[in-house]
Amino acid sequence: MAALVAATFIPLKADDNLKAMTEQHEQKKLDVVDGVKMYRPFESDGQMVISDYVDIANKSKADIFVSSLMYFVERFDMETEYIEAFDDTEGTFIINKVYKSVSDKNNLLAKKDDVEFNCKIAFKSSTNSIVFRAYDIVASYKDMGVMSKKADLAKLCSSDKEKLKSFSEKYILMNSSLIKDLVEFIEKDNPQKVTHWSTIAANDVVQGMNPTEVKLSLGIPETVRTQGTKDTWMYSNDYVVIFTSGLVSRIIK
């Protein structure tokens, strides 16, 4: 897991963008694909971004923040995805996210439509709601199935080529599906209280931390072994965390 540092949330920059987001929020319930509410891009500071807010009833700012972080920590591809920065006081964090649309490797004809999207997504937690902003969105694909190319979301959306336009729709659907899944997770989750934020920011572990805090600091362990009231989490041969009755009692490194 990449080191976590203080994050500056990337806000909407102008009143017209706030208006665009609000109008989109009112209209998006009419824009549904495969049961997913679609969040559409708009221009902000010369690039296409996707930003909106989602209401989450009966959830505190702290719970939404911790649940959101845990959602990504437990699902990341650790080779390419990570939490870039966070600020526990403000309830904000930024992730580096990769979406892949890959066809059957045996279907060579379909391979030409394979695409990978890299982006950053900033989140801001508040009582009963979460705001997100996806930006720096870039698609990587092969032109004619051979030559590697890249295009940002603005180019995809404005292109006359059906292939590139289809890529923009793929990204919008994948990102919207992620937000839907995240919100459903937050609604059902009952997160543990997190207090060791400075230790987490240093990617360290100390006695007294709970499992959620250790995951936020180190990620998911390679193996877990339970014996009575003791749980042993092995991150490597040189890094082992032992819990007794749910709290860290020993660190071997």
Question: Regions from the language model: what does each represent?
Answer:
Residues 1-19:
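Bacterial Sec-dependent N-terminal signal peptides
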Residues 6, 46, 87, 113, ...:
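A generic structural signal for short, solvent-exposed coil/turn residues
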Residues 15-192:
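Ser/Thr-rich, low-complexity intrinsically disordered terminal regions
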Residues 191-253:
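Residues within mature, well-folded domains
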